[in-house]
Amino acid sequence: MVAAETQPAWHSCRMPRATQTLTAGIGLESGRHVTLSRGRVTFAFQSGAILAVQAPAELTVSSPNSARLQRGLVTVRVPGPIKGFVLETPAGRLADLGTSFGVEVDANHRASVAVFEGKIEIGEQNPQRLLAGNAMRVADSRSELDRKTIDYNVESFMNTWGSSFGIDGLHGDVRFARPGERESPERVINSDSLLLIPESGGVQLPSGSELSIVNPGTHAGPFPRKNPSRRDAILTRSTVVDSYLLQYNRSRPSPTSKDRRSTTEVRIGRPVVGIIARKVLLTEHDPRLAHPDVDFVGLVNRGLYKNDQVTLSSDRRTIQFTFDI
């Protein structure tokens, strides 16, 4: 779904996509060893945990709620109330305590760990908890002497962080929200690009919900007002969705600044159900689709403008936005 705002100083869009197993039709049984030579792949475990891997990498699917990473870089995301996912590495065991985190195992079998949300437990003997916003390099989790605090840096994990939310690619003036930004998007001021923010996941969008756009094709503003009689924008069946917010929130322009035309493309791994493009609908769906820690009360300028344009591809997996920013 897409929602956005009504002045060039701020855009926001929301996109829900149909939720299904992230195996591209291939199930991996426990004990299966995977070697990835190029690209990225995302695994959805039966427990609900999601593991996004970037090549070059080697890992083994150990059980419905655990894996072993021999080498490479991964992001582990354990959404909602799920806890207990275990990632084994040559340096030792990393246990989820309700979190998302990134791990890179180098050629010397050391594991560099960064916790994005929540917390993890490192090691079985002398276990140590690592909280969000912290990072550690582990050579042997059995010994506290082989654990070293390092600078927290998420940049090397941004590709797998986005993949863990089902994003296949971004092009143009857009970047994916860093860990921590999704809980407070109103605080992110960025004049250089739009921000794509993952919101709630696995949400039931009921039959009869009104959206702004549900059909593929090119749609130009101004977008229709809320109108239940518009059957072309009403969901005909209840659908489980993940939601994304696309926003632009620039710093206050100077007297000499100039607006510009921006084209942005977002590729999503599964079909987009629809797009919300007006403030009234965006506000209506906030309780269901917004991140639970975000409060949009007080924001005035929401929605897309009359000169904005949105194109949804025929396979519903690519959205192109053209905005004045």
What would you call each of these model-derived segments?
Residues 26-28, 32, 40, 73, ...:
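Intrinsically disordered, low-complexity regions
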Residues 21, 35, 42, 60, ...:
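Ser/Thr- (and often Asn-) enriched beta-sheet segments in non-cytosolic proteins
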Residues 123-126, 141-146, 178, 190, ...:
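Serine/threonine-rich low-complexity intrinsically disordered regions
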Residues 301-325:
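Ser/Thr/Pro-rich, low-complexity mucin-like regions
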Residues 1-155:
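Short acidic/polar, Gly/Pro-enriched loop/turn segments located at secondary-structure boundaries
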Residues 151-298:
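Propeptides and adjacent flexible N-terminal/non-core segments of secreted
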